[in-house]
């Protein structure tokens, strides 16, 4: 791909000019604006030609159509159908105006069908694909985003534009020219990097200091957004801008101030935005807001913000500038460190494995063998990088990009290096906000696949860590959260300690017994024997006479007491405490049946 450099200079009044003032979009180019807000989309809307503009999300369309009511701009969204577009085209041609259509990739087919209905060629239009990095970024969960690409290459006049474009590996771009905008002034933004191991608590501490101006928080996880809003008790002061599904989800949970489109009238003191609003949307405010970017990879990979794209784009939404910018981040050392070269080798190996199994599938005549090989093909990683039987370059680019972003979040040194390589920031590395109870520990406790014993062991480890922390309201909050997970083990820790719990194998019965004995040793009140008996014998259960006698002897010995009048302890002694019924219990070792008691009810 050829490269062309365009210098960008400020106007005599010190303002950054709109792109249309110093550069006109050229066909077969990928334009790296470098600076968000250069007005590339607006320039094309106003250009003296027919235009089709592809944008990543509908909030962009809503905002641009509202701003360009007099410019014949027609927005194609979910409810707009080909007939609606056809009627717009008929009116536009009749009035001698320029076609100005803005659509998402998923709705592009409607535009194509509408042109066919009116008997005109859409290829006579100039096609601008805005925020083209989204082709790579989103294709893993928006497969339809690349559907218009085959049509894109048939347009004689076409361009891809972004402030953060990614180099595509698709060979159809080989003859394109990369247009690199180079600002001839310092355009870097100050950003504060705050490492933490407990995002919610860190944000709570930061925001509890008071907020004088509007705050915009970019966080691509609605569950975390709601948790933060509830933790801070800022329900009435918060608004969330997100997708339709997330709006429904939040409203179902009782939070009503949530919207699918940006509207300054809906903004509040605390404004949360998901990835739908990371790019292209114009946020115009009277005062410069504070901006927080939040990343918590332990809770969700979706919160990862790529310094080369997502961070730059998010900050660029504010057309009148920003005040404080901070990135609150947790890193995850479980993410593997990968390189471009290594990932390309992975592709080669994955492709080789796929082609080997595919050749076996083609050569096999057995129906069952073909079924097995087909299932094997479906499971191979390279299968996810194929569309219509051919390697999908954008899916491969997406895999590569995703792996490199995760690499950046392996540790703080790699993240800082990623930020520095953008050339877009002045970094201010703040003192880490580290807590005794972090998101990693919380995640392990919430892991449904862990056994009760594993979770209890984790809680004891956390409690051990908290022991060195001074008593504060925050520590009390942690303890209460742990009690909601397993109150028994928290109470046991503070009554009998870690060693007793470990020696008991984290089992309820011996731990409970130890707790009862502890009470007896410190504040005997005469009911300890009752507690021990109920801990050992349970209503509805069957016990052999031998077990009953041995257990009673053990419990009396634990407390150092004897039955009244030094009565001999036998299995029948159980009748003083429980109503029992004679029964037979099969011995699994001998195959014979032993006499026993079934516990009917307690009489103590």
Locations of regions flagged by a protein language model:
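Interdomain hinge/linker at the junction between the two RecA-like core domains of SF2 helicases
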Residues: 163-208
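Conserved SF2 helicase motif VI
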Residues: 298-325
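The feature captures the C-terminal accessory region of ATP-dependent helicases
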Residues: 44-47, 346-604
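SF2 helicase catalytic motif II
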Residues: 105-108, 116-153, 157
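Inter-Walker segment of RecA-like/P-loop motor cores
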Residues: 70-113, 253-262
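SF2 helicase motor core recognition
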Residues: 36-46, 60-62, 107-121, 162, ...
């Amino acid at each position: 791909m050829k490269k062309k450099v365009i210098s960008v200079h400020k106007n005599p009044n010190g303002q950054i000019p709109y792109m249309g003032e110093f550069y006109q979009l050229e066909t077969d180019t990928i334009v790296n604006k470098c600076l968000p807000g250069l007005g590339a989309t607006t320039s094309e809307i106003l250009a003296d030609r027919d235009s089709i503009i592809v944008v990543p999300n509908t909030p962009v369309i809503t905002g641009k159509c509202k701003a360009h009511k007099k410019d014949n701009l027609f927005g194609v969204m979910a409810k707009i159908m080909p007939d609606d577009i056809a009627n717009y085209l008929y009116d536009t041609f009749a009035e001698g105006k320029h076609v100005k259509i803005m659509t998402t990739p998923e709705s592009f087919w409607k535009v194509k069908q509408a042109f066919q209905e009116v008997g005109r060629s859409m290829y006579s239009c100039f096609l601008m694909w805005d925020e083209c990095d989204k082709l790579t970024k989103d294709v893993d969960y928006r497969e339809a985003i690349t559907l218009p690409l085959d049509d894109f290459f048939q347009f004689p006049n076409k361009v891809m534009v972004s402030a953060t474009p990614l180099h595509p590996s698709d060979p159809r771009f080989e003859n394109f020219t990369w247009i690199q905008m180079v600002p001839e002034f310092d355009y870097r933004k100050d950003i504060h990097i705050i490492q933490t191991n407990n995002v919610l608590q860190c944000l709570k501490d930061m925001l509890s200091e008071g907020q004088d101006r509007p705050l915009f928080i970019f966080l691509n996880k609605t569950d975390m957004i709601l948790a933060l809003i509830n933790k801070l008790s800022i329900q009435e002061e918060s608004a969330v801008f997100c997708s339709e599904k997330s709006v429904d989800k939040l409203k179902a949970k009782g939070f009503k101030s949530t919207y699918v489109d940006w509207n300054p009238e809906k903004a509040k003191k605390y404004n949360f935005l998901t990835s739908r609003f990371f790019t292209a949307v114009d946020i115009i405010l009277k005062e410069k807001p504070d901006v927080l970017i939040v990343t918590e990879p332990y809770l969700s990979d979706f919160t990862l913000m790529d310094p080369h794209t997502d961070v730059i784009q998010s900050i660029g939404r504010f057309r009148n500038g920003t005040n404080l910018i901070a990135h609150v981040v947790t890193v995850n050392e479980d993410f593997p460190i990968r390189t471009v070269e290594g990932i390309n080798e992975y592709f080669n190996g994955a492709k080789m494995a796929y082609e080997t199994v595919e050749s076996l599938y083609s050569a096999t005549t057995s129906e069952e063998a073909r079924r097995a090989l087909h299932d094997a093909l479906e499971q191979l990683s390279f299968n996810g990088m194929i569309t219509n039987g051919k390697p999908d370059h954008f899916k491969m680019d997406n895999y590569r990009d995703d792996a490199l972003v995760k690499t950046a979040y392996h540790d703080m040194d790699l993240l800082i290096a990623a930020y520095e390589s953008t050339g877009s920031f002045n970094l201010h590395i703040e003192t880490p906000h580290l807590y005794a109870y972090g998101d990693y520990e919380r995640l392990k406790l919430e892991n449904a696949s862990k056994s009760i014993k594993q979770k209890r062991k984790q809680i004891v480890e956390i409690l051990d860590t908290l022991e060195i922390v001074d008593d504060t309201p925050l520590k009390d909050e942690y303890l209460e959260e742990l009690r909601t997970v397993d109150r028994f083990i928290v109470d046991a820790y503070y009554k009998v300690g870690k060693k007793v719990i470990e020696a008991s194998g984290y089992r309820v019965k011996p731990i409970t017994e130890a707790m009862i004995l502890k009470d007896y040793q410190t504040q005997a009140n005469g009911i300890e024997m009752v507690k021990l008996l109920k801990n050992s014998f349970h209503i509805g259960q069957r016990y052999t006479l031998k077990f009953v006698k041995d257990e009673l002897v053990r419990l009396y010995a634990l407390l150092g007491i004897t039955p009244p009048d030094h009565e001999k302890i036998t299995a029948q002694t159980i009748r003083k405490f429980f109503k029992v019924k004679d029964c037979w219990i099969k011995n699994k070792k001998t195959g014979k049946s032993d006499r026993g008691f079934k516990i009917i009810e307690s009489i103590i």
